[in-house]
Amino acid sequence: MIRVHVVVRVLLTVTALFVTSVSVLAQDVGGDVGGGAGIFRPKNPEAKRTARTTPTTTSGRTSPRTTRPPANTAVNERFEEMLNKGNEARDARRFSEAEEAYQGAANLKPRDSRAAYGLGNIYADQQKWENAEAAYRSAVEFAPKDVDALVALSVVLTQPRGGADTARRYVEAESFARKAVQIDPKHAIAWDRLGVALQARGLLNSETEHSYKRAIDLDPQFAVAYAHLARALNRMGRAAEAVPLYAKASELAKDPPTLNLIAESLQAEQLWKDSEPVLNRSLQLDARNPTSLMLMGRYLVVFKRYQEAEPYLKQATEVSPRAYQPLNILGRAYLGMERLADAESAYDRAAQFASETEKKQLAGMFGFEGLGDGYMKAKQKESAARAYQRALDLDPGNRTLGDKLTKARSR
C-alpha cells in the first residue's frame, strides 16, 4: 500500500445524525462550507500518453529507432496506463476499480505524487475523509508546490470529523490554502479555500471576506465563492448582503457539485426549504449524484418525512456502498418509521465504515442506543439487549448503555 502519514482508516465524515426537530443544527454534509464528495471535485491527475518504441524500415529491413529508450520505459508506460485507467474508472464512479488502478500505479512509482493524488480524489469522492487526508498528505510530500494537491488537502482538513484534533486540522487547512495562494496568487479556488479554512477556525473577519471576494474577482463566474461569501456575511450579521449573493450563486450554478454546495450552505443556515428546489435541480442533472441524494434524504428526515427520504438514501448507499453517512441517515429514517430490523441492518453496515469518532456517535440516541430503546418500547427485550450490546461495543465507556443493557437482560 502507498505510504502515508497517518493510518488510513475507513470512512467518512461525521454527522451524529442530527435531528429530532427542524430546530436542531445539522452538521454540514461536506464540511463547514467546504465540500467533499460531489461538492468539491478535484481534477484527475494528469496522465501522459507515452509513445511506445516502434520499428522503422530501411532498405527493406525492419530495425528499431536509433534512440534508445530509458531502462524504465516499460515501468513509466505502465504507470501512465494505470493512471488513465484510474481516471476513467473514477469518472464512471467505479471507485473500487479506480482505487485498484491508482494503487497499482503507486506500487510502480511510490514517490510519484500523481498516484497518491488520484487515491485522495476517489476517497474524497466517497467522503472517506481520513483516507483522503492520508493520500493527499503523501501527494504534498512528494510534490510540495503542487497547488491542486495543496488545495485538495485543505478541503479534506475542513471536513467535520469530531475528535480532539479538530482545531489543529483547521489550522493546517489554512496553512495549506495560504501556501497555495502564495504559489499561485491567481488561483481562484485556492483563495476560496483560504476563506473556508479561516471561517472553519471561527475567524469571520476582513481577511475571510477578502479571500472570498478575491476568488470572485479572479473568476466572476465562480458560483461556489458567491455561496461561501453569502454564508460568511450571514454569520457576520449582514444577511441583507447575503441574499443577492445566494441568488447569484444559484443563477451561475450549472452542475450538481455547485448546486450541492449551495444546498448544503442553505441547510447549514437552517434554510431547509430553500435547499429543496436547489437539490431538485441537481438531481434533474444527475439522478445518481450521491451527495445530492444524501442531502435530499437529510432534508426529508429533518422534516420527519421518512418514507419519502428512504428511496433517496437507499440509492445513495447503492452509488457509494462503503460510505458511512448515507447508511447512518438511512438507519435514522428507518428508526423514525419504527422499522427496527431495517434500522439495525443499516446501522450494522454503517459501523463497518465508521471511524473511531463516528463509532461513538453511532452508539448514541440516533444509532444503536435509540434502536435499543425502540426495541424496549416494542417489548422485544432480547433484541434490545443485542442493540445495547452493539452500542457498548462501539462506546465501551458509556455507563448509560451499560445500565440499559442490564435492564434489557433482566427478567
Located regions from the model:
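Structural signature of tandem alpha-helical TPR/SEL1-like repeats
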Residues: R93-E100, G104, D125-S138, R161-K179, ...
